[in-house]
Amino acid sequence: VYSGLYGIPSTGLRFFTVYGPWGRPDMAPMLFAGAIREGRPIKVFNHGNLSRDFTYIDDIIEGMVRVIGKAPAPTQDRPIPAEVYNIGCGHPVQLMNFIHTLEQALGKNAQLQMMPMQQGDVYTTYADTTKLERDFGYRPQVSLAEGIAIFAQWYEKQQTTGNND
């Protein structure tokens, strides 16, 4: 609203299922790692038939850095100087694939508790990064396997030493 009323350039960024070191403790990657490490069951909703756009934190940061220095300008087609960009990998990953990749990285099998679909949840979410790629040349660089390996190494170090690096 401010952008339209006062001509203040505004950029909104939508992040898609961010994971990596120092991730939110209430999100699936951190919860799953803790459950796997401690031998607790992971509640797998819709029997694992869900997909998400898991995006490693470095790719999120790269997208942010590319956007920060360039405020949107009004154009003839778009008189309000505002833009919204999705930052993600741009493709859905099956939840079970994510869990298996995490199991491999942690060297331990997960205990899975298959559950029905949660009310209000969606089957698939993923970012359309076409506009971000067009305007800023953004392309995610970190594969799921690479990102999970880095996350798992950091997580294990945190749990065994309490080291906050």
For the regions a language model picked out, list residue spans one by one.
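C-terminal substrate-binding subdomain of Rossmann-fold SDR/epimerase-dehydratase oxidoreductases
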Residues: 34-165
